[in-house]
Swiss-Prot record:
The gene is ilvC. Residues 182-327 form the KARI C-terminal knotted domain. GO terms for cellular component: cytosol. It is an enzyme of class 1 (oxidoreductase). GO terms for biological process: isoleucine biosynthetic process; L-valine biosynthetic process. It comes from the Bacteria. This is Ketol-acid reductoisomerase (NADP(+)).
Length: 330
């Protein structure tokens, strides 16, 4: 796997190019401001009624409609929600995209699953920082950066990779390291991590643990602390130094109990189900299901959201978080 640093990227590749960033959310604001501060000519493309227009202008950025920004741009970065990208592309990007332009993405979903099929005469690249946008921005202002992924799906002009590397450098990524991958690998591993571990697996583990304790008669408050609240303490240790750091930092009782009982929770049956989830991602079944869900008005998703909001752990959690001064907004 190739990893690139400062000396491997040249910001001059982006100079004298017009850069449009579509979207001004978590990632959009970070990319726009970092590239602007790196000396690039940046315009943010937004709907005319977007609340983000004022924010972007206040930050000193040029703002225009999506269509006009794309007409003007040599490089167009799409940092919009996955489910809205196809419609915006079909209606506002494709009719205005220059031949020889570069189309960039922060995630590979729409390219990999062929929701967006760009013409052969444009570059298609990805630059994906592996952190939230606020951290991309903060580390840049501190003179550092966060690790990034880059990928080239289509190289029409012969310099698509150089553009991706220059972009990564412009947002600070080459100071940490830039890993080369593919749209396929980024998309499939990202979706799997979200579904099986980060957003799906962990949430179900928390709820199951909470329910096991409360059904056995223990107070909901204690169940919340042990199964939800303290998870951050453990995840922070993983984040800082991996599994070994966590095992070193907890008590011997916790370490032994975790190593001997954990495999009884995440069993071979759970891993077999993970493999099925991965297969659904690889063969496109999940993508089709999600796209159909979006097109049908989010009926199932809204029902699941409501179910989660009404779970007892949310009720007791809201009460206990009210006791935590460090969580209260100043």
């Amino acid at each position: 796997m190739n990893i690139y640093y400062e000396q491997d990227a040249d910001l001059a590749v982006l100079q004298n190019k017009n850069i449009a960033i579509l979207g001004y959310g978590s990632q959009g604001h970070a990319h726009a401001l970092n590239l602007k501060d790196s000396g690039m000519n940046v315009c943010v493309g937004l709907k005319t009624d977007s609340a983000s227009c004022a924010k972007a202008r206040e930050a000193g950025l040029k703002v225009d409609t999506v269509a006009e920004a794309v007409k003007w741009a040599d490089i167009v970065m799409i940092l919009l929600p996955d489910q809205t990208q196809k419609s915006v592309y079909d209606n506002e990007i494709a009719p205005n995209l220059k031949s020889g332009a570069t189309l960039a993405f922060g995630h590979g979903f729409n390219i990999h699953y062929k929701q967006i099929v760009p013409p052969a005469d444009v570059n298609v690249i990805m630059i994906a920082p592996k952190s939230p946008g606020h951290l991309v921005r903060r580390t840049y202002t501190e003179g550092n950066g966060v690790p990034c992924l880059i990928a080239v799906h289509q190289d029409a002009t012969g310099d698509a990779k150089a553009i991706a590397l220059a972009w990564a450098k412009g947002i600070g990524g080459t100071k940490a390291g830039v890993i080369e991958t593919s749209f396929k690998d980024e998309t499939e591993t990202d979706l799997f991590g979200e579904q099986a571990v980060l957003c799906g697996g962990s949430a179900e583990l928390i709820k199951a643990g909470f329910e096991t304790l409360t059904e056995a008669g223990y107070p909901a408050e204690l169940a919340y602390f042990e199964c939800m609240h303290e998870l951050k303490l453990i995840v922070d240790l993983y984040y800082e130094g991996g599994l070994s750091r966590m095992n070193y930092s907890v008590s011997d009782t916790a370490e032994y109990g975790g190593m001997t009982r954990g495999p009884r929770v995440v069993t071979s049956a759970a891993k077999a189900e993970m493999k099925k989830i991965l297969e659904e991602i690889q063969d496109g079944r999940f993508a089709k299901e999600f796209i159909d869900e979006c097109n049908s008005g989010y009926k199932k998703m809204n029902e699941l959201r409501e179910s989660n909001r009404n779970h007892p752990i949310e009720v007791v959690g809201a009460k206990l978080r009210g006791m935590m001064s460090w969580l209260k907004k100043k």
